[in-house]
Amino acid sequence: MKTLKCVLVLFSFVGLMLVGCSDQSQSPVSPMDQGSLEKKPTVTPFTGADYPIPPYILQEAVVHEQGQKRIMHGLKMLERWECSSDLMDGTMINEVNGVQDNDTGEGTVYGKVTVTPYKDVGGGVWEGEYHGKIVQSGTPGIWTCTLSGLGHGRGGIIEGMKYKLEVVLKVNGFPATGWLGTITGNIYSH
């Protein structure tokens, strides 16, 4: 009987070896190695300029005054993004919101954008959000607005791509009568 048990156990081990069962993982690479197989995004830096396309106001803002604060909501403007990357180079609809001091014009600005590239990207657009501060520049009648933005591609060949950028605007007047901005950023794609 002992011999029969030994033979059965031996055949069981041989059978398991033949079908590939073992206590070793059959994964071709370890979990640590699997992480290195994931694609890292391609980073494409870009620079550019941001300025209004006359007549740039598409929709007037709703403005409320609260003490020294001027609260603006829903101003829609048409702008030109002249960028070194043809994926970002195009026109932008910018919805601006903000809270500014009535005397100094300083405050916070935030909003959302839709950028339509001039390049044929299969109908895709960029959608994003931004926030920042506007402060007096030291030159009378000029303010500096520094913005940080994040966005993503929707549709066409830019679907799934992302961008991150910084914009520095020199703004004329309070309320603004015009501006010229510099853009620096990166596009992230897989």
Where are these regions (language model features)?
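Beta-strand-enriched cores of mature, soluble protein domains
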Residues: 24-190
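Bacterial N-terminal signal peptides that target proteins for export
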Residues: 1-8
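C-terminal motif of bacterial Sec signal peptides marking the signal peptidase cleavage site
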Residues: 17-20
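Short, linear, compositionally biased motifs with a strong N-terminal bias
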Residues: 10-13
